[in-house]
């Protein structure tokens, strides 16, 4: 009797059984089976080696508490199977402390016997404590405090460096622009002599641009000359009309050695004339500058004319007391005697004619400043 499937099923079963090993042999995932089977003996060998090392390590002899807790721990573990080993250790410690000496004596004697036996078995034994794993704990704590997710990558670090350099460049350029020249309000009404010449009609740098007396702010070089111009004889602006006395005065002051700031202040002719340091725009506006002269300039011309008349009448410098003007001067007392002494020692041709002029001009300047004119 023929089968209901007409013999196809048997042929399919034979074909599948024959083709299955051929197909399985082409894939690589079938090979690790042998590797897995071969890996089992290796793991067994590693575990056996660890056990042999543990057995080879010499243990320390037990003390009385360990001898007593060996059997007591087992009893507590059977009574309280849910308790953790740490809880069992706490309970054993409390119960051991509560025991009296008579109860502890057999365990103490057993511990002493084990110690003697250990010495006999291992005469060269030396206790070597295990290394504490503090380094690994510290590393773990650092990883917890500083997780790797918060550490920026190399690209972020490069971006931070570029941003820092850009900010530093902007800051340096801003500082350079701010430090090149002071603010506009700094030069308003200021002069090299400061307090002593604040009441005079000194032309300001920052006036209206529409006025004829307007001049641009000083450059950096002019600002340096302004701040350090006390001892220099640089005169960017001079009067067009000079008297013979002023010519003698300029020639003599160039020969005076400048040993202190007071000498430099008294040696510059613009200090006597009441003229402050003016920028180069003063040359382009001589009319506007001449209209703003101080009263000391007019009085100076009168003093010089009176001095010429007194020289023609035969007055000598010996008739003048050199110390009577000290009470009117607002400078340091040593500045004028030093200047007088230096001028007296000068052997120039105009040394005898310069002293009265200097004293009268200094008195005139200080008088106007004291009276607030």
From Swiss-Prot:
CDD domains: HMG-box_SoxF
Molecular function via GO: DNA-binding transcription activator activity, RNA polymerase II-specific; RNA polymerase II cis-regulatory region sequence-specific DNA binding
Domain of life: Eukaryota
GO biological process: one example: gastrulation
Chain intervals for the UniProt region annotation (Disordered): 33-55
Record's GO cellular component terms: nucleus
Compositionally biased intervals (Basic and acidic residues): 39-55
Keywords associated with the record: Activator, Developmental protein, DNA-binding, Gastrulation, Nucleus, Transcription, Transcription regulation, Wnt signaling pathway
Region (Required for transcriptional activity and interaction with ctnnb1): 324-328
Annotated InterPro entries: HMG_box_dom, HMG_box_dom_sf, Sox_C, SRY-related_HMG-box_TF-like
Entry note about domains: The 9aaTAD motif is a transactivation domain present in a large number of yeast and animal transcription factors.
Main function: Transcription activator. Doesn't appear to bind to the consensus 5'-AACAAT-3' DNA binding site, but binds 5'-ATTGTT-3'. All of the sox17 proteins are required for embryonic endoderm development and gastrulation movements, and show some redundancy in function. In addition, the sox17 proteins have distinct but overlapping roles in later gut development. Acts downstream of vegt-signaling in endoderm differentiation to induce a range of endodermal genes both directly and indirectly. Also represses wnt-responsive genes to inhibit wnt/beta-catenin-mediated signaling.
Protein name: Transcription factor Sox-17-beta.3
UniProt lineage: Eukaryota, Metazoa, Chordata, Craniata, Vertebrata
Annotated gene: sox17b.3
